[in-house]
Amino acid sequence: MSDSKCPFHHAPAEGTSNRDWWPNQLRLEILHQRSALSNPLGEEFNYAEAFKSLDLAAIKQDLTALMTDSQDWWPADFGHYGPLFIRMAWHSAGTYRTGDGRGGGGTGNQRFAPLNSWPDNVNLDKARRLLWPIKQKYGQKISWADLMILAGNVALESMGFKTFGFGGGRADIWEPEQDIYWGAEKTWLDDNRYSGDRDLENPLAAVQMGLIYVNPEGPNGNPDPVAAAKDIRETFARMAMDDEETVALIAGGHTFGKTHGAGDAANVGPEPEAAGLEEQGLGWRSSYGSGKAGDAITSGLEVTWTETPTQWSNNFFENLFGYEWELTKSPAGAHQWVPKGGAGADKIPDAHDPSKRHVPTMLTTDLSLRFDPAYEKISRRFYENPDQLADAFARAWFKLTHRDMGPRARYLGPEVPAEELIWQDPIPAVDHPLINDQDISALKSKILTSGLSVAQMVSTAWASASTFRGSDMRGGANGARIRLAPQNEWEVNQPDQLAQVLKTLEGVQAEFNSAQSDGKKVSLADIIVLAGCAGVEKAAQNAGHTIKVPFSPGRMDASQEQTDIEAFEVLEPIADGFRNYMKGKYAVSPEELLVDRAQLLTLTAPEMTVLIGGMRVLNANVGQSKHGVFTQRPESLTNDFFVNLLDMGTVWKATSKEEDLFEGRDRVTGDLKWTGTRIDLVFGSNSQLRALAEVYASSDAQERFLKDFVAAWTKVMNLDRFDLA
C-alpha cells in the first residue's frame, strides 16, 4: 500500500459542516457549553471547597519567589517578572464588557483560542508557562483563572504596592467559549466595528479585532493623543470604568515594566494556535537576534515609562508632566514619544544590560492623560497627590480583576476586603428568621386571593429573576430591584402594571410582617418569586393537575442607594423572547436574541424550549399580546403551545415585510387560528428545536412538560441564590 494512502476513514471533523452549507443556522450549541463531558474533574468536584483548602500565604510566597527567579528560556525584564504578570492578569480581566457581561478573567479563558493567540496577547503564553510549576504544585486547589489574577496581585505587592484585596472563586472552563461575540472582522486588527462618527458596535469594547482595549499608537495607528482619548473613554466606559478609574489604571499599570519592539514584527512566528506541534502550545517564536530579553518583539513598541520599573512610584506622572514630548518611532517602526531636545537622557535603565541607559518614552495613549482636558485634571491631581493615585489604582485594579465575579458573596479567601462597594450590587444580609413551610402556604393563599391574575404573578416574577446574567453573575430576583430605578421604568416590565402588582404584593408583605411577634419577616424579593410560584401552581390546577413549585426563602431587599442606576441600565433587555418582546428592530434576528438570552440565563435548549411553551400558555407576553398564545385556555399550564404549533392543519404566512409577524390559518377553511412571531415559529421551523417541541407535543407529554417546566422555572428563580449552591 502506498504511504500516501491512509487506510483509515477521514477524521470526524473533516469535511463540509452544516454551518458551511447554512451559515445563518441558529447556533444552539452555545447552550451546551461547559458540559461535564469536557470537564476532567467530574461533576462531583466543587471548586469553592477545593479553594478553601488552599494555603493562600504559601502560594503567595511561592509566587513572590518566582518574580525574581529569571529563566534563561524567557529572561525577566529588569530581573523581575512582575510587570509581565500584571499584563497577563490585566489582559485576562480586561476583556470584560458591560454590554452583555461576557469576557473577563472569571473562567481562565486566556488559555484557549482565540484569546491565547490574540495580537494583544503576544508572549503571555510565556507568563502562563512560567506559572505552570506553581499550578502543578497546588493542583486543583487553585484554578488557572484565580492563579492568573492572584499572580497579578502578588506582582504588584512584590514591587511595593499595597493592593485592595483578592477574592478567589473563579472556576476554570475546559474548552473555548462559543457564545462570546468578539466582532465580525476576518483579519487581525481590522476595525469594521465602527459606523457613523466612530460609533462602536455593541456589545464590543475593544477598538480592533484582537486588541484588549485601544490601539496604543492612536486610532488606527494615528498618533493623536486627543483623538486617542475618545477611544480610551469609550472603551473603558464599556468596561464599567469612569474617567478617574481609567487614568488610575493606565498610570498605575504603566508605572511598571516596558513594552517590546526590538525589531521588525516580520521576524515573529505564528501564534500558539497556528504554531507547530514541537512548540508545545507556545507561539510567536522570533528569529530576531536571540528572540528574547533585549531582542524581544511583542507590541512593536519599545517603551519604558519610569526610572524604577520594578518599584511603585509616582514617576509616570513626573515624567508625563516633566517633559515636552515629540513623536518618534520604535525600532519596529511603531509610533511612540520621547522628550524633546534630548531631555531625560540616561534616566531609564535597560531591561537586560546594566551598561545601557535610555530616555523616558511614552505611548500616544499615555499622552492622552495629559492632553485630554478631563483626563488632565485627574492626572494633575494624582501627580500632586500620590497617595490619591495609590488609593485610586488599588481600587480600580480590584474592580478590574473582580468586576465579572458578581456579588461579593461569591468571593472566597482571607483577603476579601470588608468594604462594600456599589459596583458589587450589594444586598443586605439576612437579619431575621425566615418564613417556614406553613408561612409559605399561608402567603400563597393570600396572594392567590389578592386579585392578581396568573399572568401578572408569573410575568412579574419572571421580570425580576430573568435579569440574571451568567456571564458576570449580575441581576436576578434577589434584592427586589425590579421595584427600583431603572428597572421599574423599563418598557419590558410594563411600568404601570408593575406598579399595581408591586403595590398588591407589598400589601401582602406588610400584613404578614406586622402580624409576627418573633422578628420573623418576609422580603418583597421573596414575595415576588413566591407569587410567581403560586401562579404556576394555580395554572397547573386550572389544567387539572396538582403540583408544588419549590421555593427557597432568603432573598433580601436592596435599597435605591445600593443600586447604581447607570450600572443597571445595561441589564435592560432589548429583547426577551420568553415574554415575546422586542424593544426595536435589530440586525440580529429575534430567534438569535432568544438563544443569546437563554445562554445568559445558563439554560439548555430543552430548558429554553419548555419555558417558552409554558410562558406562552401562561399568557405572560409583554402587553398581553396574543402572539404565540396557541391555546383556547390561557393561564392553564398545558402543552397546547407545542400541540398547536405542530398541527399540520395550520398554514403559516408572514404578515409583515420584515417577516417578523405571522398568522396561522386553517388549511381547509382559511379561518385565522393563531398569530405568532419568529420566536414562536422557530420551534417548528428549526430542526433541532422541532425535535424538542415534538417531545412536549406528544400525547404522553403532559406530565413531563409540567415536571420540566417547573424545574426550569425554579432554576431561573434561583440563579442568583449563591447561598444555595
From Swiss-Prot:
The keyword Transmembrane does not apply. GO terms for molecular function: catalase activity; heme binding; metal ion binding. There is a cross-link at residues 213-239 (Tryptophyl-tyrosyl-methioninium (Tyr-Met) (with W-90)). Belongs to the peroxidase family. Peroxidase/catalase subfamily. This is Catalase-peroxidase. Heme b binds at residue 254. It catalyses: H2O2 + AH2 = A + 2 H2O; 2 H2O2 = O2 + 2 H2O. It comes from the Bacteria. One of its GO terms (cellular component) is cytosol. Keywords: Heme, Hydrogen peroxide, Iron, Metal-binding, Oxidoreductase, Peroxidase. It holds the Pfam family peroxidase. Its cofactor is heme b. Its EC number is 1.11.1.21. One of its GO terms (biological process) is cellular response to hydrogen peroxide. Bifunctional enzyme with both catalase and broad-spectrum peroxidase activity. It is an enzyme of class 1 (oxidoreductase). Binds 1 heme b (iron(II)-protoporphyrin IX) group per dimer. It comes from Hahella chejuensis (strain KCTC 2396). Formation of the three residue Trp-Tyr-Met cross-link is important for the catalase, but not the peroxidase activity of the enzyme. There is a cross-link at residues 90-213 (Tryptophyl-tyrosyl-methioninium (Trp-Tyr) (with M-239)). The active site is at 91 (proton acceptor). The record marks 87 as: Transition state stabilizer. InterPro entries: Catalase_peroxidase, Haem_peroxidase, Haem_peroxidase_sf, Peroxidases_AS, Peroxidases_heam-ligand_BS. Homodimer or homotetramer. The gene is katG. PROSITE patterns: PEROXIDASE_1, PEROXIDASE_2, PEROXIDASE_4.
